[in-house]
Amino acid sequence: ADGAIERRLPLPADVADRIGGQGLEGVAVDGDGVWVALQRELADGPAGVVRLGRYTPAQDRWEWYGSPLERTAVAGDWIGISEIAASDGALLVLERDKLNGPDARVKRIYRVVFPDRPGASSGEGDLPVLTKTSARDLLPDLRATNGYVQEKIEGLAVAGNGRLYLVTDNDGVDDANGETQFFDLGPVGEALAG
């Protein structure tokens, strides 16, 4: 394929310096804006609130919003964002725990309506926290094949045909069965109706 990098866009230093061991887990484009999702909370940020960033290229401007994460009481577990997609005036946010098999508890798609208010201009200051609504619990889909429930649902896409697709990431590690699963959940409006 032909192509060339036209521009590299670093994250603002006051965000990038506080990401820790995780990083970006999703990028979505809607109209004139580019959305990014951090996988976990900033190192010194509010507990249980992950950052969603909106970059507007025409103004070379970043804005930051918070999205509340589900909670876990399981030792060694954490909740994070795996992916985002833009659809019908909202971000679809894929949130998951680190658990697999029969222990898996949180594998969900949430809907976060695009905000009509400005976000925080940096990693500092007041962070507007957006409201999320549950759009689909994915555990029934993962269990429907009567196989092993994968830890990492890592891909979410609304394709040009209007269908919603998911994919797992087996990471190729020793504590996973090596299986990758691909799901066609159907037309996005129907897939997220419940």
PLM feature spans:
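Sequence/structural signature of beta-propeller domains
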Residues: 1-194
